[in-house]
Design a protein with these regions (language model features):
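Beta/alpha (TIM)-barrel catalytic core signal, keyed to glycine-rich beta->alpha loops juxtaposed to Asp/Glu
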Residues: 1-144
Length: 145
């Protein structure tokens, strides 16, 4: 981006770097703002890492990260607080500098649930506990991420 003429890039699509297991995007907010580049955040569920269903077989994350996220999802289930809800709330409510977050689902009911989660208050104690469970796997990336 440093080598492109100013104004050439209007926005970027970031995925899996502003979610419960990875907040790397925060390190780049000033860079984008200084250049007038808008940010679209995507995949608050980290491509399925942060789901009760579990990580898809094709997911490129390393096993220790998959296992840490599975433990976090199990904890959330035990607490009666779906990790999907916490993940969507975290990605949409904590940082006003990130105005747009995209998520997808093949199930229309899940889309409606995700939309409703945005209007509910975020439980910061749950966020802290989940991030504690993920532990040293926070910000662990995989190829092409």
């Amino acid at each position: 981006m440093e080598n492109t003429p100013e104004g050439t890039i209007e926005s970027i699509l970031n995925f899996c770097h502003y979610c419960l297991n990875d907040d790397l995007l925060l390190d780049y907010l000033d860079f984008f703002e200084e250049r007038g580049i808008g940010i679209i955040n995507a995949s608050p569920l980290s491509m399925g890492l942060l789901s009760q269903r579990g990580t898809p077989d094709w997911h490129p994350a390393p096993e220790p990260l998959k296992e840490a996220c599975a433990r976090a999802a199990a904890y959330c289930t035990e607490q009666g607080y779906p990790i999907e809800k916490l993940a969507v709330q975290y990605s949409t409510s904590l940082n006003p500098r990130i105005a747009t977050t995209l998520f997808s689902s093949a199930n229309p009911e899940n889309v409606l649930k995700n939309i409703s989660y945005v209007d509910e208050p975020l439980d910061m104690e749950m966020v802290a506990k989940v991030r504690e469970i993920i532990g040293d796997q926070i910000r662990v990336r995989w190829k092409n991420s």
